[in-house]
Design a protein with these regions (language model features):
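Surface-exposed assembly/interface segments
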Residues: 1-313
Length: 313
């Protein structure tokens, strides 16, 4: 160190230095998120000492509030909460709703045991699973896989009938009417099929429809598509048009052409269908520097219901 007789004291977790201080005595060391120092006197050189007996502690509601404030500036597709605290659940639900309504940032919360969230941005996990080694995971623990699977799915993919890795059964088991009731209530449920656990239907918790928010919004594939389009168009506008393109007919036509080209790519990848250039309009806004974009799209969903008619002659 630069200080004579002083030592660099590093806290290493998982091979990474998470805290480093320079001190001569124990009293000069400050507690960090991992270690609370004790003792007195001068420090002595050591090549490292493994610590044990620590505890993770239990996060308080304020910790979750701080966490949400910390992640808000970032872009993310899925937020997972694997706890049962109803206060935290309510805060998480309110958070993703506000991001969509006020910030134009579209993400989904994945949690378990919520009480009728009824929102397209909330996925409510009902099922636990039994793994091949006999371990039983609660619905809260299933949020880990479900959240990762939802975040990893593309806008042209559905998780309906997707298999849960190494799972052989579900907990609790449901009857056929139980599955119907759960799906009707907007719950994300799993079922066992010949020793393989699968997603019954890739849906969110939305169950109350309006003129604007209709049945297709209940499907997570549709939500992924809409979120992708909204986020991509914003990014395209931000990267290449804000402060660069004139807000006149020519400038607006340039932006429309870019959007049309983008949506044609989405259509080629089976995200939307029956799209035509006339389905996009870019108009001047009320302010001199504003534009208004209107899109009309028809999402493509995956086949989930097959009706067979047999005629006997």
């Amino acid at each position: 160190t630069d200080l004579e007789d002083a030592f660099a004291v590093s806290t290493v977790v998982g091979g990474e230095i998470v805290d480093q201080q320079t001190a001569k005595t124990v009293e000069e060391l400050s507690a960090n998120d991992w270690v609370a120092w004790s003792g007195t006197g001068a420090l002595a050189a050591t090549v490292g000492k493994a610590l044990s007996g620590g505890a993770d502690g239990s996060p308080a509601s304020a910790d979750y509030t701080d966490f949400l404030a910390a992640i808000e500036p970032y872009k993310f597709d899925v937020l997972i909460y694997d706890g049962t605290d109803t206060t935290v659940q309510d805060a998480m639900v309110a958070f993703v709703k506000r991001l969509a309504a006020e910030e134009g940032a579209y993400t989904q919360l994945v949690a378990a045991g919520l009480t009728n969230p009824d929102d397209r941005f909330v996925v409510n996990i009902m099922s636990g699973v039994v793994l091949s080694d006999g371990t039983t995971l609660t619905p809260q623990q299933v949020t880990w896989w479900a959240g990762g699977a939802l975040a990893g799915a593309q806008y042209n993919e559905s998780l309906t009938y997707a298999a849960y890795p190494n799972a052989v059964d579900v907990s609790p088991k449901l009857t056929n009417s139980g599955y119907i009731d759960a799906l009707t209530a907007g719950q994300f449920v799993l079922f066992a099929d010949g020793g393989v656990v699968k997603v019954e239907q890739d849906i969110n918790s939305l169950v109350t429809y309006t003129t604007d928010i209709t049945g297709p919004y209940h499907k997570n594939r549709v939500i992924r598509l809409l979120n992708t389009i909204a986020n991509d168009i914003y990014q395209q506008f931000s990267d290449g048009y804000i402060g660069v393109v004139n807000n006149n007919e020519q400038g607006r036509m340039m932006f429309k052409s870019a959007i049309v080209g983008y949506l044609l790519d989405i259509q080629a990848n089976n995200g939307i269908q029956n799209f035509e250039a006339e389905d996009v309009t870019v108009e001047p806004g009320e302010a001199i520097d504003a534009i208004v974009v209107n899109l009309a799209i028809q999402p493509v969903d995956s086949v989930e219901k097959i009706y067979v008619t047999i005629t006997v002659n």
